[in-house]
């Protein structure tokens, strides 16, 4: 053994080829500080052994290296610039040491080689992947750029245009696609991986492959003609800004870094990367996006832990077909759990099956599935008009019409057809789980399971704990949601649960602006372009449906009359009473037509303005800051109330619920990250300026205490 540490082992193989194996404790290899230090020491040992003729990098895991240890980032990025620069320079010295070894090097890549893992393989002369490999630099998704030489080496390996696409999108690349652009030199079967990499090194040692020429290309400036370079980078800037926009600076910074470094050798090019990396690491956007990543890991970790208490779900059922039932059936079947789709009407079953078939056909058309896989998924969906079909179901999801009496009746019926230990969950967005549980003989086997529409696109599922729901019931539904590919958060029962409870105060703020003459299209523009929502409140209400919004608003008013009670007609009432239901009937705040791609196209409609003018008077202009404050303050305070009341267990789960359930702007990180960035004391001072608008604008006593103590919701 040439070198050994808890994360890396180096041994000498035959023909004097050294094998460096990444072998960290745990299921995957990460580039944490310990691994980086071990790699540095291992390379020193390798350099000192004069017998070594070549080096192959391997992994003992199913993956190569998944990237840096992101749990270290927030603490590290909070350090002074000088400390951060020192860390980046030391890390890059290790990668340079690997690249400068006096003999050929190769990487044997299986599974993920992402971020620092990708930058590791780029520092070797040859790269061999097996068919499971996925390679990429996802750093821009975290608000930063690659910091271990990725922006320098990748363009010199695969060309500037390809590198710009890889780095600015942050997408993983399959082995076959990486081979096409030259990121890897060969793709082989998993069992042949190490042997293929070693053979490539033998050929290099025998001078059949010119490893030094490859290395020199990475050490030199890009060989791009001046005009071609100008066109390439100008085009990239336009395309990247069109996608990333002003709120996400990292992709544009990546283009700029690659452009500036294109005429430099390695040392100068790396300095350009270092400076841009440090600048981005200090941004609120990076803190927010890294926070989302860590929160996502936290939520998934909780779900995995809950799985230990879960009843195994081998068969499922959904009651109520149509679009929602069909979406749930598709999601379950496509992730491997057979499901019965039960309804009382054949047309509804046909609609549900058609919905599943449509979603699968779209997957086939995009090349993400095959006709054979589509047939297998459809065979996992069993439509039925008979309750007898659900008798072997481990979990039954009730998804009938959103009416308490109808749901209660169906739930009571279901218990008579399933086994004693079957779990029943209601897909409801507003109806109390405790209320529905009153119709159940075994309320401990019952909880809520709130899917968001469209089911196949929305990652969040709210699992609602009723006062009688058992831990096994909650754990089993959490595990089933995870198995379906969803991110579950557990919330306690209350009107609107978590997501809708915090959404409707936002709509109340919007209604308040319109009642004073606000222009709904102008408000949407501010909330989309400046705050960063994917849809402004008027557009969102049109998509949700004004009938749904009207009903849910009434539920919230009844549940929280002190804050959400209504004293008169509001804009949602005006639209609903004039049968303007939104996209579903082609007219709401906006009017809708179908564009050339078959997608809904919205236009401003004078009729809407006329109805609102009759109700509230002439239009009045509001400043953007005023619009943001009046809509967001109620949502933020209600989110804090949910945490204080234990409706949601942690800031991390609340923020993931907002990002995944409502599309809260990821670059702001969620309500609690937004509060911490703004400063709780600053928010309290802002809210107090609007306190005259009513209960929704009154901060809690606990918020005032936190503000007075200069506290925050996140510890890092």
Swiss-Prot record:
InterPro entries on file: 3-OHacyl-CoA_DH_CS (IPR006180), 3-OHacyl-CoA_DH_NAD-bd (IPR006176), 3HC_DH_C (IPR006108), 6-PGluconate_DH-like_C_sf (IPR008927), ClpP/crotonase-like_dom_sf (IPR029045), Enoyl-CoA_hydra/iso (IPR001753), FA_oxidation_alpha_subunit (IPR050136), FadB (IPR012799)
A Pfam family recorded for this sequence: ECH_1
Keyword NAD: yes
Region feature (3-hydroxyacyl-CoA dehydrogenase): 311-716
Active site: 450 (for 3-hydroxyacyl-coa dehydrogenase activity)
Pathway, per record: Lipid metabolism; fatty acid beta-oxidation
A biological process from GO: fatty acid beta-oxidation
Molecular function GO terms recorded: 3-hydroxybutyryl-CoA epimerase activity; delta(3)-delta(2)-enoyl-CoA isomerase activity; enoyl-CoA hydratase activity; long-chain-3-hydroxyacyl-CoA dehydrogenase activity; NAD+ binding
Keyword terms of this UniProt record: Fatty acid metabolism, Isomerase, Lipid degradation, Lipid metabolism, Lyase, Multifunctional enzyme, NAD, Oxidoreductase
Region (Enoyl-CoA hydratase/isomerase): 1-189
PROSITE patterns reported in the protein's UniProt record: 3HCDH
Residues where NAD(+) binds: 324, 343, 400-402, 407, 429, 453
The keyword DNA-binding is annotated on this UniProt entry: no
Reaction catalysed by this enzyme: a (3S)-3-hydroxyacyl-CoA + NAD(+) = a 3-oxoacyl-CoA + NADH + H(+); a (3S)-3-hydroxyacyl-CoA = a (2E)-enoyl-CoA + H2O; a 4-saturated-(3S)-3-hydroxyacyl-CoA = a (3E)-enoyl-CoA + H2O; (3S)-3-hydroxybutanoyl-CoA = (3R)-3-hydroxybutanoyl-CoA
Marked site: Important for catalytic activity: 119, 139
GO cellular component: fatty acid beta-oxidation multienzyme complex
EC number: 4.2.1.17, 5.1.2.3, 5.3.3.8, 1.1.1.35
Residues annotated for substrate binding in this entry: 296, 500, 660
NCBIfam families xref list: FadB, PRK11730.1
Subunit structure: Heterotetramer of two alpha chains (FadB) and two beta chains (FadA).
Family statement: In the N-terminal section; belongs to the enoyl-CoA hydratase/isomerase family. In the C-terminal section; belongs to the 3-hydroxyacyl-CoA dehydrogenase family.
Protein purpose: Involved in the aerobic and anaerobic degradation of long-chain fatty acids via beta-oxidation cycle. Catalyzes the formation of 3-oxoacyl-CoA from enoyl-CoA via L-3-hydroxyacyl-CoA. It can also use D-3-hydroxyacyl-CoA and cis-3-enoyl-CoA as substrate.
Protein name listed in UniProt: Fatty acid oxidation complex subunit alpha
Recorded name of the encoding gene: fadB
């Amino acid at each position: 053994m040439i070198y050994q540490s808890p994360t890396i082992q180096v041994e000498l193989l035959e023909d004097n080829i050294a094998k460096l194996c990444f072998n960290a404790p745990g299921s995957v290899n990460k580039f944490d500080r310990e691994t980086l230090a071990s790699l540095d020491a291992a390379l020193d040992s390798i350099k000192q052994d004069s017998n070594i003729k070549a080096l192959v990098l391997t992994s003992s895991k199913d993956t190569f290296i998944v990237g840096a240890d992101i749990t270290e980032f927030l603490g590290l990025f909070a350090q002074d610039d000088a400390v951060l620069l020192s860390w980046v320079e030391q890390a890059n010295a290790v990668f340079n040491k690997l690249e400068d070894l006096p003999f050929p090097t190769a990487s044997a890549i299986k599974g993920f080689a992402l971020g620092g893992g990708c930058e590791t393989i780029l520092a070797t002369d040859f790269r061999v992947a097996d068919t499971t490999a996925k390679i990429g630099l996802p750093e821009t998704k975290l608000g930063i750029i690659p910091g271990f030489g990725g922006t320098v080496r990748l363009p010199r390996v695969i060309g500037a245009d390809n590198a710009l696409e890889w780095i600015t999108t942050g997408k993983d690349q399959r082995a076959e696609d990486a081979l096409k652009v030259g990121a890897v030199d060969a793709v082989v079967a998993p069992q042949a991986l190490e042997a293929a990499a070693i053979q490539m090194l033998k050929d290099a040692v025998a001078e059949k492959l010119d490893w030094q020429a490859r290395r020199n290309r990475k050490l030199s400036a890009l060989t791009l003609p001046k005009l071609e370079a100008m066109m390439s980078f100008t085009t990239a800037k336009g395309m990247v800004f069109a996608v990333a926009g002003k709120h996400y600076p990292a992709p544009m910074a990546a283009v700029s870094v690659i452009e500036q470094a294109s005429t430099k050798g390695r040392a100068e090019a790396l300095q350009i990367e270092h400076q841009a990396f440090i600048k981005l690491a200090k941004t609120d956007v990076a803190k927010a996006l890294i926070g989302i990543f860590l929160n996502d890991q936290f939520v998934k970790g909780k779900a995995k832990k809950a799985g230990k208490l879960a009843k195994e779900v081998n068969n499922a059922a959904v009651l109520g077909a149509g679009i929602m039932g069909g979406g749930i059936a598709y999601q379950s079947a496509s992730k491997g759990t057979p499901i019965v789709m039960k309804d009382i009407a054949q047309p509804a079953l046909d609609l549900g099956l058609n919905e599943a078939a449509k979603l699968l056909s779209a997957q086939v058309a995009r090349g993400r599935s095959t006709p054979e896989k589509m047939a297998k998924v459809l065979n996992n969906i069993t439509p039925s008009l008979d309750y007898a079909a659900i008798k072997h179901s481990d979990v039954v999801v009730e998804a009938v019409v959103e009416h308490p009496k109808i749901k209660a009746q169906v739930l009571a019926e279901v218990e008579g057809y399933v086994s004693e230990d079957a779990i029943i969950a209601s897909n409801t967005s507003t109806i109390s789980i405790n209320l529905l549980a009153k119709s159940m003989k075994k309320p401990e086997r019952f909880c809520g399971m709130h899917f968001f529409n469209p089911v196949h696109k929305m990652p969040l599922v709210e699992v609602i704990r009723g006062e009688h729901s058992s831990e096994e019931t909650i754990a089993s539904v959490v595990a089933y949601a995870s198995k379906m590919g969803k991110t579950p958060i557990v919330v306690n029962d209350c009107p609107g649960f978590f997501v809708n409870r915090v959404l409707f105060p936002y709509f109340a703020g919007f209604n308040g602006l319109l009642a004073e003459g606000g222009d709904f299209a102008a408000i949407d523009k501010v909330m989309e372009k400046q705050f960063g929502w994917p849809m402004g409140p008027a557009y969102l209400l049109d998509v949700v449906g004004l009938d749904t919004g009207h009903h849910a608003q009434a539920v919230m008013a009844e549940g929280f009359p002190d804050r959400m009670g209504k004293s008169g007609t509001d804009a949602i009432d005006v639209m609903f009473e004039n049968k303007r239901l939104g996209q579903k009937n082609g007219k709401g705040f906006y009017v809708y037509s179908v564009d050339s791609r078959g997608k809904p196209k919205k236009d401003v409609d004078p009729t809407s303005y006329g109805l609102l003018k009759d109700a509230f008077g002439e239009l009045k202009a509001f400043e953007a800051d005023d619009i943001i404050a009046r809509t967001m303050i109620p949502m933020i305070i209600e989110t804090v109330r949910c945490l204080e009341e234990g409706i949601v267990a942690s800031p991390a789960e609340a923020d993931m619920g907002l990002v995944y359930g409502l599309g809260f702007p990821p670059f702001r990180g969620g309500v609690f990250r937004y509060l911490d960035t703004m400063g709780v004391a600053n928010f309290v001072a802002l809210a107090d300026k609007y306190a005259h608008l009513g209960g929704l604008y009154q901060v809690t006593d606990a918020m005032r205490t936190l503000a007075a103590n200069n506290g925050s919701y996140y510890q890092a």
